[in-house]
Amino acid sequence: MAPFPDEVDVFTAPHWRMKQLVGRYCDKLSKTNFSNNNDFRALLQSLYATFKEFKMHEQIENEYIIGLLQQRSQTIYNVHSDNKLSEMLSLFEKGLKNVKNEYEQLNYAKQLKERLEAFTRDFLPHMKEEEEVFQPMLMEYFTYEELKDIKKKVIAQHCSQKDTAELLRGLSLWNQAEERQKVLKYSVDEKADTEAEVSEHSTGITHLPPEVMLSIFSYLNPQELCRCSQVSTKWSQLAKTGSLWKHLYPVHWARGDWYSGPATELDTEPDEEWVRNRKDESRAFQEWDEDADIDESEESAEESVAISIAQMEKRVLHGLIHNVLPYVGTSVKTLVLAYSSAVSSKMVRQILELCPNLEHLDLTQTDISDSAFDSWSWLGCCQSLRHLDLSGCEKITDMALEKISRALGVLTSHQSGFLKSAGKAASTPWTSKDITMPSTTQYACLHNLTDKGIGEEIDNEHSWTEPVSSESLTSPYVWMLDAEDLADIEDAVEWRHRNVESLCVMETASNFGCSSSGCYSKDIVGLRTSVCWQQHCASPAFAYCGHSFCCTGTALRTMTTLPATSAMCRKALRTTLPRGKDLIYFGSEKSDQETGRVLLFLSLSGCYQITDHGLRALTLGGGLPYLEHLNLSGCLTVTGAGLQDLVSACPSLNDEYFYYCDNINGPHADTASGCQNLQCGFRACCRSGE
């Protein structure tokens, strides 16, 4: 209970409200996440409203209490001259208008907490002083009835301003979004007297056409786009427009660099210290134990910073994969994950699956393995790829190159050379009872070669070239089944060798080899299946020649037809593909313009597990006719023969940008640029110990 009668106690009731506001902002301050822009702005708006109410309270006291007391006592002066309210309001306004990013928010938060603590230390004693000093003076200089009248006026003034929202409008407080909206408004009558009249003749930013909003959004960085997506459903849909997300740099974004333009070509590698810092981040993140005791040492503090950076990177990647790429993945052209501390093969696999139209992929110095490319599981699934950098990816093997080559597709000109219609198909079907095979377990299920094409996954988990031991192969024949008249697989048990119709039986003699201009690979095409081709390809009888059919270990594919001039077929095919459906790779006819294997840049620097087998996998489907830059520095196990096979399939290769180990006697030895990894501290090189 107040020490003075309630009817004449002019301070206690208003001060109770002020103390309540102090408690509220202290509570909000302790719970606010200053890294979150929405929380940050909500706190500042709340503080601005609170301190405006403090200011209003001060003005009411000056006019109805202190002013009257000064008229009757000469000892009262400058009671509210140093309460810092104006300075605090100015601080909040600057925060609302000037703070743009998370880094500035965190710096501002530190200053804000210090200033609020100082204000609270002064404000609470100030109210106590008024209650204990000025209230007795009021009792001395004013009558009972005068004090009752003063209190009524003070309470009435406070209540009239109680609606905070109206108070904010009256004092022209607008948050940043409202200010922008106000600027964009146009009014028929600029001298409208009321807010209602203004709104009738104005258009806010939310009413702009989608085309205009999309143009505005194109100037925003990814962080700002994510904020805009939280404004409304309409803005959320616009922010997910693919054209706004063509270029992704999640590693840079996690470190505060929100660049999202086209990839820039850097001629210089980062220095060893920078690379070492990235490795330290990755190591600290992998070794981090959430349940470990906190170590306050300097070394621990450095590791803590590294862990924080890696965690931020992981959050950015997770957000992209689950919240952004499902909507915009088909529009993504550039993905740079170079020197990532947190990226994993699984993450890369998910991203590649969601981004089929990538043109620029940089995975430099990441800890990925072959499984990162498992999503490139069907032919031509990433045929727009022009730039691929796997420098320093030490876990990459030939299997990854096989998947990459498959994803690049097949040249249209390469297909047309040996995918020719063989006339009208014969109508006589073959029956399963006339055919027998020695063992059905040797032959995997054949895929139905229809024109569904690119929309379906046509491969199993094995790569293009999965060598299989030839020891278990008992049949000297390769069976070519008609694609449109396949028997039920259960009927295969009754098949016989006799009366083979609608099959092309090719004997795999030991003298089967390549003859450059007449190489059999030019006459064979089809979709890969797990039939006994793989077993034949493991035979020593097949010598490496760099062609898709002849490479040892290359899984050959089920054929639907062979050219009529082929000497391999003992019996002419009865059934062939209908006219107009010979482009079985893609399921539809394609234009004359090349759409596959357009790779211009390939770096495998430091990928020391790569062998000739992987290089030859890149020659499949027409080679790499547009490749200009090839870096094989640190690929220690490749040979001159393997390099020659690859170079022969890369007619556009520029010797100036062709790098390989100096110890290899390979092609263009006099004009190629040699190894780039000499005395390099973070890439594989045969001379790294020198």
From Swiss-Prot:
GO terms under biological process: intracellular iron ion homeostasis; multicellular organismal-level iron ion homeostasis; positive regulation of protein catabolic process; protein catabolic process; protein ubiquitination; SCF-dependent proteasomal ubiquitin-dependent protein catabolic process
Cofactor(s) the protein requires to work: [2Fe-2S] cluster
Record note on disruption phenotype: FBXL5-deletion mice die during early embryogenesis. FBXL5-null embryos accumulate excess ferrous iron and are exposed to damaging levels of oxidative stress. Simultaneous inactivation of both the FBXL5 and IRP2 genes is sufficient to rescue embryonic lethality.
Post-translational events: Polybiquitinated upon iron and oxygen depletion, leading to its degradation by the proteasome. Ubiquitination is regulated by the hemerythrin-like region that acts as an oxygen and iron sensor. Undergoes constitutive ubiquitin-dependent degradation at the steady state by HERC2.
Residues annotated as binding [2Fe-2S] cluster: 661, 675, 685-686
One Pfam family in the UniProt entry: LRR_6
Tissue expression per record: Ubiquitously expressed. Highly expressed in early embryogenesis with expression decreasing as the embryo progresses through development (E11 and E15).
Binding site for Fe(3+) 1: 15, 57, 61, 130
UniProt superkingdom: Eukaryota
Annotated protein name in UniProt: F-box/LRR-repeat protein 5
Species of origin: Mus musculus (Mouse)
